[in-house]
């Protein structure tokens, strides 16, 4: 049984990020039904309940390190995590997860990422350094691949794929009506 740690912007009630997490989990379970998944989350109880995964609080360094140590693969997944427009701290957080994973000798994959913009010169250099340590990088568009290459990330590590939410099955008409009724629409 594979043990995978998933890092992203999960547990913050963002519908798009939660949809990405759902798509990632479904994709991984299609490959290996009994895969052991742990998600770093801002709300681990909610994430565990919604997605039937193990979850740890992403701002508890000891819990993160323990989860990382117990995993075989660190998957940094979904969304535009590597950018410095909204916050340089969030960029440092996600790069530290990738870097720590490699420090602990784990396989690390960036999964269906949107990259950039990364404007600060130091942030571009750090992103290049850390991403070059990753085992595999998949990005959701050509612009993200170009951004990584411009920063000096090895082209051989980068594969252009699709946004992970595109793998989700659409809701049926009846299911959609039920959701709208529950929402009072």
Regions of interest found by a model, annotated:
Residues 1-185:
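Active-site anion-handling motifs in enzyme catalytic cores
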